[in-house]
């Protein structure tokens, strides 16, 4: 008998199997290109209230820039989004699939995945952009 913890909780697994829309979260910035926490929360609430099945954070349009040490927004953006999604779940009793983008070579990707797990994310969407010159074997080992 397999004693490992299931990869996804049963409600999240069932929800995902039913088929849901999970939009990628754009980064909300002020006109002076500073992180706009108020508008970021509003954007998250818009997606959730519109019926999305979850939100993917730190992917696509925000994937690389928020990780830049000079910008330093990766943890802040993931944390804010997780907090807003958990509040929505508590308020509506409707599960959301929380997806975190994970990038970089294995050490960075593992660190990002561990942070996402600590914040309550369900799934990591792994970018293989760091392996553009790598072999398939290197990418498979990374995953």
Task: Show where each model-derived region lies.
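Active-site beta->alpha loop and helix N-cap motifs at the rims of alpha/beta catalytic domains
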Residues: 2-143
């Amino acid at each position: 008998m397999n004693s490992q913890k299931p990869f996804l909780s049963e409600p999240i697994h069932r929800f995902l199997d039913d088929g849901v829309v999970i939009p990628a979260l754009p980064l909300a910035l002020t006109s002076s290109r500073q992180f706009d926490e108020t508008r970021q929360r509003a954007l998250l609430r818009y997606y959730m209230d519109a019926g999305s099945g979850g939100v993917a954070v730190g992917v696509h349009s925000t994937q690389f820039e928020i990780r830049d040490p000079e910008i330093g927004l990766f943890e802040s953006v993931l944390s804010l989004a997780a907090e807003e999604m958990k509040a929505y779940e508590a308020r509506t009793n409707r599960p959301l699939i929380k997806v975190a983008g994970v990038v970089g070579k294995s050490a960075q990707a593992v660190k990002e995945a561990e942070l996402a797990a600590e914040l309550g994310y369900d799934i990591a969407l792994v970018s293989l952009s760091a392996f553009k010159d790598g072999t398939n074997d290197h990418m498979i080992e990374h995953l």
